[in-house]
UniProtKB/Swiss-Prot annotation:
SUPFAM superfamilies per the UniProt record, alphabetical: P-loop containing nucleoside triphosphate hydrolases (SSF52540)
Bilayer-crossing regions: none
Family: Belongs to the AAA ATPase family.
The protein's name in its UniProt record: IQ and AAA domain-containing protein 1-like
Gene (name only): IQCA1L
Gene3D superfamilies: 1.10.8.60, P-loop containing nucleotide triphosphate hydrolases
């Protein structure tokens, strides 16, 4: 895409953003519980449109070169990402489940499941690539020091006679195989000649022989042409992949090269802009600084005089924490300040009179409302969205675009150089704030002298606001048990003890799964739709990747400290943990019970271990703390075989450490378990704020799994391989089982035979039979457990209430008919 195309995409994105901001006002209106479906539909439509907007802003930010526009785009990108996470939280509260049936909404807006993909901003890794690389080198260096120097393997000697016998055996075997092949061919030729003699020779004339040869040859040519035409047609309509993979890869790689060139240009323009920022700041301080200082002093002196004339005393000077004099003179004249003071005094008097009247009225109205509701028996729940932290930021960015960039006459190829006038305006505000701090200090001293000279009054100390008794504000600060140690030493200690590991590089898109196409249909017939692998991937992207990727998004988004992945073995839980680390460049800490065996023994040791892990995780953000077999930390009754590792010893310290995480601490606890029934429900749900249930893959996901995993081995499926049949037969098997079957079948030897013997479905069935599937009893047990979680209970209660309401409605209709 050209620079003009990115400019047009930016403009169209702001037009869409304006429409969404208008819709936000309608969403603020509370809705009764009986209108839950329409409320969910409005939330889902907003969520979908914000996802599309996030995708477009990410594309423009990644390729826009102009540095000032990029800064605005970054704020908008973070704001929209935060709003997506807020809407996801609202959808969970409205739907009472983690997966949402959005197929009807997609159909109404003529969108595809690809539009539901959560885009991961590219700057997550690009802007911290240096940090991630340096951290990887440090980790590799520590690990190399731990590994013992591999000594040369000593091979057992072989006697010369034994070696000769071994070579002779191999050579004789080779000659025997060749002789057997040769004899097989001779025998086959003899049998063929014998059959011909028995049938007798058929004499052809020259013309008949020519016609026969032509007939066979023309038939062969026509079959070949028909097959080729059919393949071309199937490739054209997208039913078969293109055979020319080299051409396909070259087409894909060309835009990537252009994007890399654009990023190099971004770095050059950014360096120019930073140098210009320093130059503009210094220039403004020298040229306009003295005039600004004198103007501020005159304005503040005039305020002193006006207040003294109006109230008979000099005002209290605003504290620096409240903005100093800026809070009073923000684009105001002395006359406006005087009018405001008079209005404030009048309003204060009115408020005092109205408060006493309103108290009595409110109490009476509350009593009446309660009595009426009690009589009617109607206590209708209200659905309403929570106040957004991101909307003000988005509105400010959109307004800046309208005021600064919208009405500019840009050419087809807009200039990518910075705008000096806009830069000077921004720097002028910064210089003004710096000078105002200096002026405030001088004017506070001048105010003291005025009070002494005019009112003969000493300086009045500012009274601290009274604290309400019985209420504790803030949280207790964590006691630093390792204040005398550096981060580097703690980091090395964790690596040596095996608590900090190198994560494998796994992209989140490699977690393959398809969309649930019949979610709304299942809901209509009162069947509970289970999440697909697509839903699981999206939830992990929303709950973990987007939050950990950016500090600004983490601060604005609803705080989520921990998630628990629950599902049978082979569902890819560990793969998702690695994908989160890869997509965000996060450190991976392993606090699995098996990994803690023999490390940091005793009660104090466990406390120290959790403290060090969370301290390093906070200092080297982003970080992922993984606990495999998470149910063991909350065993109802510890089995005999696990008593030695004492898995419950970090339970208390883990809960305390999680509570200390605040917005801005990009640390995520991710637990994985396949047997949550063994754990105490209350403790597990207290630690893990979000629980993602991972059932067996459905037909659509299994079909995509078979196809993509075979293609990943470098093989294009042919018509001989019935993938649909494989997807049906493999019901009950996890992605791990499917991968094992593919790896077993596609050996090196089988790969070499593909040209002569194409793959067929029966080859994979033999391998699947050897594996144990996820039986229905196991999955039902996991479902029953999930519906005992807090969110699962709410969902089941809501469904029961709906069924009861429908039954009551049907009973009323039957009575009316009678």
């Amino acid at each position: 895409m050209s620079e003009g195309a990115y400019q047009r995409l930016w403009e169209s994105s702001h037009a869409t953003l304006q429409e969404l901001l208008d819709q936000e006002q309608l969403l603020l209106e509370p809705a009764p519980d009986r209108e839950r479906q329409s409320f969910q539909y409005r939330l889902a439509s907003l969520y979908l449109h914000y996802l599309g907007l996030l995708r477009r802003f990410d594309t423009v930010y990644d390729q826009m070169v102009q540095p000032q526009k990029r800064r605005l785009l970054r704020r908008l990108l973070d704001g929209v990402a935060g709003r997506v996470l807020e809407l996801k939280d609202e959808l969970v509260r409205a739907d009472l489940c983690e997966n949402h049936c959005l197929d009807r909404v997609l159909q109404d807006f003529k969108l595809t499941p690809a539009d539901l993909e959560v885009p991961i901003p590219k700057y997550f890794l690009l802007e911290q690539s240096t940090t991630v690389r340096e951290r990887g080198l440090i980790l590799a260096e520590i690990l190399s020091r731990l590994e013992p120097v591999s000594s040369q393997k000593s091979f057992t000697g072989m006697h010369r006679t034994e070696a000769i016998i071994l070579v002779q055996k191999a050579e004789r075997a080779r000659q025997g195989r060749l002789r057997a092949t040769f004899m097989r061919e001779i025998r086959r030729d003899e049998e063929q000649d014998g059959r011909i003699r028995e049938d007798g020779w058929h004499k052809f004339s020259q013309g008949q022989a020519a016609v026969t040869i032509q007939k066979v040859w023309k038939g062969y040519l026509q079959r070949k042409r028909t097959q080729q035409d059919r393949r071309m047609e199937m490739e054209f309509i997208g039913m078969l992949p293109s055979p020319n993979q080299v051409e396909h890869l070259s087409i894909i790689s060309q835009p990537c090269l252009v994007e890399d060139v654009q990023r190099l240009r971004q770095m050059e323009k950014e360096e120019e802009f930073r140098a210009a920022m320093v130059k503009a700041h210094d220039s403004l301080v020298e040229t306009e600084g003295p005039d600004m200082k004198e103007k501020m002093k005159e304005q503040i002196r005039q305020w002193f005089i006006e207040c003294h004339d109006l109230t008979g005393r000099f005002p209290d000077y605003p504290d620096a924490s409240s903005g100093g004099s800026y809070s009073i003179f923000a684009d105001k004249t002395p006359e406006q300040v005087r009018m405001e003071l008079e209005m404030q005094m009048q309003e204060n008097r009115k408020k005092e009179q109205e408060k006493s009247k309103e108290k009595g009225k409110d109490e009476k109205e509350k009593k009446k409302g309660k009595e009426e509701k009690a009589k009617k028996g109607e206590v209708d729940a209200v659905l309403q969205v929570l106040p957004s932290k991101c909307i003000p930021m988005i509105c400010a960015g959109h307004e800046e675009y309208l005021n600064t960039w919208k009405n500019r006459c840009e050419s087809i190829h807009p200039s990518q150089n910075y705008d000096s006038e806009t830069l000077r305006e921004e720097k002028r505000k910064e210089v003004e704030l710096e000078i105002r701090i200096q002026v405030d200090e001088l004017m506070r001293q001048e105010l003291r002298k005025l009070r002494l000279a005019v009112d003969k009054e000493e300086e009045r100390p500012l009274r601290a606001p009274k604290k309400t008794p019985g209420k504790k504000t803030g949280k207790k600060k964590e006691k630093d048990l390792t204040s005398d140690r550096s981060v580097e030493s703690l980091y090395e200690e964790l690596v040596i003890s095996g608590l900090l590991r190198k994560s494998e590089s796994v992209a989140l898109k490699d977690y393959i799964g398809d969309f649930l196409y019949l979610g709304s249909t299942l809901s209509l017939v009162k069947k509970l739709p289970m999440p697909s692998l697509f839903d699981i991937r999206q939830n992990v992207a929303l709950y973990a990747v987007l939050r950990l990727g950016s500090p600004d998004i983490h601060i604005m988004a609803p705080l989520i400290r921990s998630i628990l992945l629950v599902g049978p073995s082979g569902m890819g839980k560990k793969m998702l943990v690695k994908a989160v680390c890869t997509e965000t460049g996060a450190n991976l800490f392993d606090l699995s019970p098996e990994n803690l065996l023999g490390k940091y023994p005793g009660r104090n040791g466990a406390q120290m271990m959790v403290h060090i892990v969370f301290k390093v995780a906070r200092l080297l953000q982003p970080s992922v703390i993984w606990i495999g077999n998470a149910e063991k930390n909350f065993y109802k009754k510890t089995p005999k075989e696990d008593k030695e590792m004492d898995p419950k010893r970090i339970k208390k310290d883990l809960t305390k450490a999680l509570r200390l995480l605040t917005p801005g601490d990009r640390v995520m606890l991710i637990g994985t378990t396949s047997r949550p029934q063994l754990a105490e429900m209350r403790g597990l749900c207290r630690v893990y704020e979000r629980i993602l249930f991972m059932p067996r893959p459905d037909y659509a996901s299994r079909y995509v799994l078979w196809k993509r995993m075979i293609e990943a081995r470098g093989i294009q499926p042919t018509q001989h391989l019935d993938i649909s049949a494989l997807a049906k037969v493999s019901d009950g098997y996890t992605p791990g089982h499917i991968l094992q079957a593919i790896q077993s079948v596609l050996s090196e030897r089988r790969f070499l035979q593909l040209s002569k013997r194409p793959l067929v479905a029966s080859e994979f069935l033999g391998q699947l039979v050897k594996l144990d599937p996820v039986y229905r009893e196991e999955e039902e047990s996991l479902k029953d457990w999930y519906f005992k979680t807090p969110l699962g209970k709410k969902s089941m209660k809501h469904r029961m209430d709906q069924l009861e309401a429908e039954e009551a409605k049907l009973d009323k209709e039957k009575k009316k008919r009678k």
